[in-house]
Amino acid sequence: MAKQYDVLFRLLLIGDSGVGKTCLLCRFTDNEFHSSHISTIGVDFKMKTIDVDGIKVRIQIWDTAGQERYQTITKQYYRRAQGIFLVYDISSERSYQHIMKWVSDVDEYAPEGVQKILIGNKADEEQKRQVGREQGQQLAKEYGMDFYETSACTNLNIKESFTRLTELVLQAHRKELDGLRTRASNELALAELEEDEGKPEGPANSSKTCWC
Amino acid sequence: MASPASTNPAHDHFETFVQAQLCQDVLSSFQGLCRALGVESGGGLSQYHKIKAQLNYWSAKSLWAKLDKRASQPVYQQGQACTNTKCLVVGAGPCGLRAAVELALLGARVVLVEKRIKFSRHNVLHLWPFTIHDLRALGAKKFYGRFCTGTLDHISIRQLQLLLLKVALLLGVEIHWGVKFTGLQPPPRKGSGWRAQLQPNPPAQLASYEFDVLISAAGGKFVPEGFTIREMRGKLAIGITANFVNGRTVEETQVPEISGVARIYNQKFFQSLLKATGIDLENIVYYKDETHYFVMTAKKQCLLRLGVLRQDLSETDQLLGKANVVPEALQRFARAAADFATHGKLGKLEFAQDARGRPDVAAFDFTSMMRAESSARVQEKHGARLLLGLVGDCLVEPFWPLGTGVARGFLAAFDAAWMVKRWAEGAGPLEVLAERESLYQLLSQTSPENMHRNVAQYGLDPATRYPNLNLRAVTPNQVQDLYDMMDKEHAQRKSDEPDSRKTTTGSAGTEELLHWCQEQTAGFPGVHVTDFSSSWADGLALCALVHHLQPGLLEPSELQGMGALEATTWALRVAEHELGITPVLSAQAVMAGSDPLGLIAYLSHFHSAFKNTSHSSGLVSQPSGTPSAILFLGKLQRSLQRTRAKVDEETPSTEEPPVSEPSMSPNTPELSEHQEAGAEELCELCGKHLYILERFCVDGHFFHRSCFCCHTCEATLWPGGYGQHPGDGHFYCLQHLPQEDQKEADNNGSLESQELPTPGDSNMQPDPSSPPVTRVSPVPSPSQPARRLIRLSSLERLRLSSLNIIPDSGAEPPPKPPRSCSDLARESLKSSFVGWGVPVQAPQVPEAIEKGDDEEEEEEEEEEEEEPLPPLEPELEQTLLTLAKNPGAMTKYPTWRRTLMRRAKEEEMKRFCKAQAIQRRLNEIEATMRELEAEGTKLELALRKESSSPEQQKKLWLDQLLRLIQKKNSLVTEEAELMITVQELDLEEKQRQLDHELRGYMNREETMKTEADLQSENQVLRKLLEVVNQRDALIQFQEERRLREMPA
């Protein structure tokens, strides 16, 4: 069978209920937009393959319910993510304030080397804006994240932000990826990798922390 | 607004023309219009400009604006692109008309002949976004106000023809009715041109019309001379279409459409249909258009049982022939199916009338689908060249459930017109043909998802439509035989030869196979392979092969105490379970060395799966690529059986098989006892002889592929999708598997029984981190209940543990719960429901609702919403299945519900199309497999019986047989791949249903909920998460496979 992609990454969308996580995702994967809000139940995911620097990256994007009652469920999915979108709504000061809480959740539940990016969605709703662009930038800077204002409605910065986070993950894992490739070509099969990861200690541990 | 009694007769004629709903009315009003304006009809684009200039009428303005906009696209070069081209279009179906319109816009002279005199096809076509946009741009809304106003996008063939006819007439296409094209008349001498043979008695001017382009759109049955047609055969498939009168009553408008339900992912629907009506269907679609249009695929057995077909005839033509179909029974059948699918809400369901005034219901056969080998040709005689192009059904017969008919038809019409433009530009015949063929290659792969997104940009130029376009995919060299110079001898196309030659070189002869086996087993103590019989008798060679390909499963030392039978059985089973290689012969036959052919066939599976893998490093190897799909399905099936076994555990059985063993019922004869060593394999279901190519192995038992079908519905069974009833020992598809002994009524089809290995399961296992395939000595997992130890218990246990989890890819550490304890996870899950008792925030943001639908509706200025919006009655919930349970809450959120429904419809449609494409391919594979089997049987007989034939001949036969086996293997692999996609679809459907069910609960008043409600709500949520995790498992499976393929 033809090789369909080069690498698989898991990205995760989190943020308050109603900030537009599902809309961002639908716009990105299906180029569709539905303006009425249907809250996500639990978790869901969609797949998309994109090309980053000539590498075909298959991304599995997990969409989570923003509602509080699901958080115990959704948190279980943090640990498998390599990249996380923290999303707020520029017309909701509250959702912006809550980013702090989301960040602390990420710190607690997500793996160490996870890449993060801040998204201020609904940028088309200029008249209802409650969060200034600079505020977003400021917050992103504080946490050392990239920042985008997006609009799923007008398709603003959607592709850009998804590509950016994928790039960041790719960069973070570049070394391991290359390593994996060479090893693979040396016919050191993944059996060894799997065993390495099973061991709590040892030289393989360094690669483990990067890969979590 | 103008008064209805306009003073200008031309205005009246125009209004009549626009509104006309009958073909004759269109033509007569158009002639009236031309007469009133003093314009001669059929004069090409100049006629259009004259009418436009003469008819100064407000109502026409919007139409002119649209047509002008289209005509001004640069590709048409202001209608000058093809001014010297003369075209004949045969057939006024949607595709013929669409092509004619494009040719007219290019400035060509276009004459169209159609043998019929009216449009009477009620059947409804699904539209892709680009066709909707395309038709809108041609003024569809002007001619047909209801265009795409329903929940699904479709149009009846008749309306589509009417509106395209009107456009074609306005653009100056010359149209002749009741004229049949019967063939070409080559130019009799130099200086003359190509003409058409027409019947009956065409007007003189038409008979003498000389043209240089012929576009054939005359339907699937008519293909011009010189084109070759390829038949794609599937298994018998009977389609039924029915049109009922749409009275447009309030009740009727409320009934939701069905964009398609297919059995392969929604068994429940069809099961209840069968129970209620005796009707057994594969799928059903309902569109509400001018008529209530239903189309379904019916199973032959139920048609016979219900008296729709008089007798079972092997020839499909006869089976569905007039003499064998009982019209009244067919009507009853269609009505009952329609009634059930719409919950009886459509009232009395009166049939619409077809062209002959009879009830519009038809049974048709789509077992075979035709496809032209090439899409265009050039013929040349006496210096006159004729370009022939195919569009519509005669190019590719559409497979109706895909809803591709009109979309691909339009694409081909555009491609044909583009070809004519290139032709007119003076490109050479071979160049034009090569480009056209390059485009034709793309056609069958097109889908709304893989075309350019921006449908507004679609135009004649293929680059505006197809991404990744390569017009040089086919070279002029390859199309030489499409350029026919009559003076030469007609060159016959050699169609199949290159194919067979390819396989010859790719196949491995028996010597190569023997050599390979020697290589693989070299160095293993006590193994010396010299032939395909006695060398394998002690089982050691087979163990050595498996050990070499998958080290770590067995230490050579362990073999010491094993007998030949035990060793052989072990090797066969491990090869199946761990390498995905299904047995071709029994352990007894291997030992007896009685079936060298079978052994060759079996070993060639290994060879084709592993020949490209190097083992120098001695590390774990995996089948290079695809066999893992078979492996995966096998695991799925076994885990499914285990689930069942668990259920049955309580029922005492005299001879208890180990739980991990796929349970065969006592009714089924035990292979080892009944099979004489060395005897030929017999099918355990029909008892007849099994030729090698026919052998299909399930849990170590051999059947004919065709015998291994559901005991109830006779559908072919696939790994991961069948079950054996412990009581009667019969096999069933999951839909028909008797459920009575299941403890829990299964609300969601087969959800519980289909336990996909999920990554989440690893949380529940105390020892989740052991990647099963890599362990040299398996660690007994404490989670498993102690059970009777058998000789291979450690292996069994190992395998068992491997079933529940997909080994994590090497790229990541195995998932661990945040605080690494499954109890914690479970508890947190439970606690997450505590909050449900308090009034939580509504799942909607009110302001978002308000602006909800306006945007979704239409950007189109002349949108007239004629259909009332579906009122918010509980009936509507029927499609959303379980939502019907609480209509009260639903009415509070109308917009939410409508959007949800619309989205659900779209998703449903996509899934349905995908499912149908898969189903079709599966059927084709099955048909091909049968052919291979027949061929293989012949060869095998020849090989076995004619011992007197020369060795040379025998060797040739043997190699041929091997080749067939390899072909079959690759088909089996493809089948498995497709089944994985089916699993994906199945899960998506389940997720959707659970999601809807859950929303039903969530929107109920919290205070009204009983404890039981909360509990089942909780349960549904858990199921939903489980399904998501199972979908994830499939993604992981693909990833895992990719990683394995990497070294290769």
Swiss-Prot record, chain A:
Quaternary structure note: The GTP bound form of RAB15 interacts with REP15. Interacts (GTP-bound form) with MICAL1, MICAL3, MICALCL, EHBP1 and EHBP1L1.
Gene Ontology cellular component list: endomembrane system; plasma membrane
Covalent lipidation (S-geranylgeranyl cysteine), chain numbering: 210, 212
Sequence positions bearing Cysteine methyl ester: 212
Domain notes: Switch 1, switch 2 and the interswitch regions are characteristic of Rab GTPases and mediate the interactions with Rab downstream effectors. The switch regions undergo conformational changes upon nucleotide binding which drives interaction with specific sets of effector proteins, with most effectors only binding to GTP-bound Rab.
Residues given in the record as GTP binding sites: 17-23, 35, 39-40, 66, 121-122, 124, 151-152
Described function: The small GTPases Rab are key regulators of intracellular membrane trafficking, from the formation of transport vesicles to their fusion with membranes. Rabs cycle between an inactive GDP-bound form and an active GTP-bound form that is able to recruit to membranes different sets of downstream effectors directly responsible for vesicle formation, movement, tethering and fusion. RAB15 may act in concert with RAB3A in regulating aspects of synaptic vesicle membrane flow within the nerve terminal.
Residues spanned by motif Switch 1: 31-45
Catalytic activity field: GTP + H2O = GDP + phosphate + H(+)
Bilayer topology term: Lipid-anchor
GO biological process, one term: Rab protein signal transduction
Activity modulation: Regulated by guanine nucleotide exchange factors (GEFs) which promote the exchange of bound GDP for free GTP. Regulated by GTPase activating proteins (GAPs) which increase the GTP hydrolysis activity. Inhibited by GDP dissociation inhibitors (GDIs).
GO function terms (MF aspect): GTP binding; GTPase activity
Name of this protein: Ras-related protein Rab-15
Name of the gene: Rab15
Pfam families, sorted: Ras (PF00071)
EC assignment: 3.6.5.2
Cellular localization per UniProt: Cell membrane
Cofactor: Mg(2+)
Family, per entry: Belongs to the small GTPase superfamily. Rab family.
Keywords recorded for this protein, A-Z: Cell membrane, GTP-binding, Hydrolase, Lipoprotein, Magnesium, Membrane, Metal-binding, Methylation, Nucleotide-binding, Prenylation, Protein transport, Transport
Top-rank lineage group of the source organism: Eukaryota
Enzyme class: hydrolase
Sequence segments annotated as region (Disordered): 192-212
UniProt KW Nucleus keyword: no
Chain ranges for the short sequence motif Switch 2 as given in the UniProt record: 63-80
UniProtKB/Swiss-Prot annotation, chain B:
Coiled coil stretches, renumbered: 847-867, 906-949, 974-1031
Ranges of residues in domain LIM zinc-binding: 681-743
Keyword Thylakoid annotated: no
Cofactor(s) in the UniProt record: FAD
Chain intervals with Polar residues compositional bias: 747-765
Phosphoprotein found in the keyword field: yes
Provenance organism: Mus musculus (Mouse)
Catalytic activity: L-methionyl-[F-actin] + NADPH + O2 + H(+) = L-methionyl-(R)-S-oxide-[F-actin] + NADP(+) + H2O; NADPH + O2 + H(+) = H2O2 + NADP(+)
Protein name per its UniProtKB record: [F-actin]-monooxygenase MICAL1
Alphabetical list of CDD domains matching this protein: CH_MICAL1 (cd21196), LIM_Mical_like (cd09358)
